[in-house]
Amino acid sequence: MLITDEMIPDSIAAMEADSKKVVVYRPRSLVVGMGCRKGVPVEELDQLLTDTFQSHGLALESIGCIATAEIKRDEPGILELADRYGVAVRCFGVDELNGMFDENGGNPPNPPLRKGGEDFVRLARDPSSAPHRLLGVWGVSEPAALLASGAVELLVAKERSARATVAVARTVFG
């Protein structure tokens, strides 16, 4: 039995080809933070998502939820994408999202959290003036992924298409 939210390694695929039975369990451990312009079709959002997961070796079957800004709660493309993957949409307000940045859109001055002997700061790393100008938030995909997952770091930092952004964090269990 293999428990993973990553793509199946070639060695496991080779075992299956040799008629050895392998059970793969996909925990719903990945949180997708997503932001987009109004009216972006589900196909465009799904392409960004699948390209991002493939380039980082992640399994789409392990998506636990899609996190976004409260203002995107009724965005058709995001709702259709969540339905396509059978997951919920979690929404966060302006104050929650901006709480991941300092008041100028930069990193907050709090001390870093300790993890594995290295310093990590629980915050989004790539503030953007575009969503701040339009929605009043410094970013959507990175802070939403961190907030929904409870993680202290992103698994995949913000990636962009022409009209959308995506970031991924792994859910903290226990």
Regions found by a protein language model. Give the residues of each.
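Catalytic cores of large soluble enzymes that bind and process phosphate-bearing ligands
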Residues: 41, 70-73, 131-135, 158
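A conserved beta-strand->alpha-helix junction
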Residues: 88-101
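C-terminal edge-of-domain segments
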Residues: 4-16, 22-25, 141-174
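Short glycine/threonine-rich loop-to-helix capping motif typified by GTGT followed
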Residues: 71-85
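Conserved mixed alpha/beta catalytic, RNA-binding, or beta-rich assembly cores of soluble enzyme
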Residues: 1-72, 171
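Exposed, flexible binding/inhibitory loops of compact, secreted disulfide-stabilized domains
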Residues: 55-56, 78-79, 125
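A polyampholytic, Gly/Pro-enriched intrinsically disordered region
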Residues: 119-144, 155
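Intrinsic disorder/low-complexity segments
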Residues: 104-119, 125
